[in-house]
Amino acid sequence: MVVAKKSLGQHFLTDESFLDRIVNALPPLNPLKLVEIGVGLGDLTLKLLDRYPLKTYEIDSHLCEKMRSKLKAQKKPFKLELVEKDALFLKEEEPYFLISNLPYYIATRLVLNAFKDPKCRGLLVMTQKEVALKFCAKDSQNALSVLAHTIGNATLLFDVPPSAFSPPPKVFSSVFEVIKEPLKEKALASLAQAPFFEEALQKGFEMLEDFLKACFSSPRKTLSNNLKKSVSYREKLDKVLDFLALENQPTSVRASEIKDYLKLLNYLLKG
């Protein structure tokens, strides 16, 4: 019997109906490689291997050993490449699509890593419902939604109740997908001065992420007040006010009311 480790935030999805819904929600992958974070009890992994070759990152050596034993007992049409490694250090040389039931405590960081990785062309993941709602929120409601919609389209697919897991978490989970769009990535890469596109895209994402941290540092306060507290952006406050005037937005605007952060940051970088 496998005992979930609290230190790794393990809650294993065991409900067959939700496992099937996740697999069926995958978009057409050809020619993308499919990469999974976390093998868990192997239930999702085994279902994926009925349809696709798969590479899985798993930090728990005990779960890796259990998965190897299952594969010996169950022959699958496609092969699994099982990597015993922390997914925070995930690095692929070829374009891939990411799928995972992410541990709550590190889900946001792993999703942002995927956003930043030019080789990742999209993702289908499950997180705590509150986190999924932030990524999939429309317009500029929070920094995570701005980042998600700057690189592509984020869509909330369905909720998963605690009863679908072993052990059950205290909150609902949600499955969402983000499909990256090349034109949006090109606009983001234009923020940075770098000789290669992938390098420019990573740098542009980091620049926008840093700017959004300052803008949303106190969401209930005005954008101007937040930027006044920022060492990096307080000197550009006059340009921010100029931009707001050009966009016919009041100086009392909050961060969540800005319509186009990429346009604003481009304006600030011009001089």
UniProtKB/Swiss-Prot annotation:
Cellular component, GO annotation: cytosol
EC numbers, comma separated: 2.1.1.182
InterPro entries the record matches: KsgA/Erm, rRNA_Ade_diMease-like_C, rRNA_Ade_Mease_Trfase_CS, rRNA_Ade_methylase_Trfase_N, rRNA_adenine_dimethylase, SAM-dependent_MTases_sf
Disulfide bonds: none
Gene Ontology terms: biological process: rRNA methylation
Pfam families: RrnaAD (PF00398)
Binding site for S-adenosyl-L-methionine: H11, L13, G38, E58, D86, N101
Gene3D superfamilies in the cross-refs: Ribosomal RNA adenine dimethylase-like, domain 2, Vaccinia Virus protein VP39
Keyword annotations of the record: Cytoplasm, Methyltransferase, RNA-binding, rRNA processing, S-adenosyl-L-methionine, Transferase
Catalytic activity: adenosine(1518)/adenosine(1519) in 16S rRNA + 4 S-adenosyl-L-methionine = N(6)-dimethyladenosine(1518)/N(6)-dimethyladenosine(1519) in 16S rRNA + 4 S-adenosyl-L-homocysteine + 4 H(+)
Location in the cell: Cytoplasm
Family: Belongs to the class I-like SAM-binding methyltransferase superfamily. rRNA adenine N(6)-methyltransferase family. RsmA subfamily.
Record function comment: Specifically dimethylates two adjacent adenosines (A1518 and A1519) in the loop of a conserved hairpin near the 3'-end of 16S rRNA in the 30S particle. May play a critical role in biogenesis of 30S subunits.
HAMAP family: 16SrRNA_methyltr_A
The protein, known as: Ribosomal RNA small subunit methyltransferase A
Native organism taxonomy: Bacteria, Pseudomonadati, Campylobacterota, Epsilonproteobacteria, Campylobacterales
Name of the gene this protein is made from: rsmA
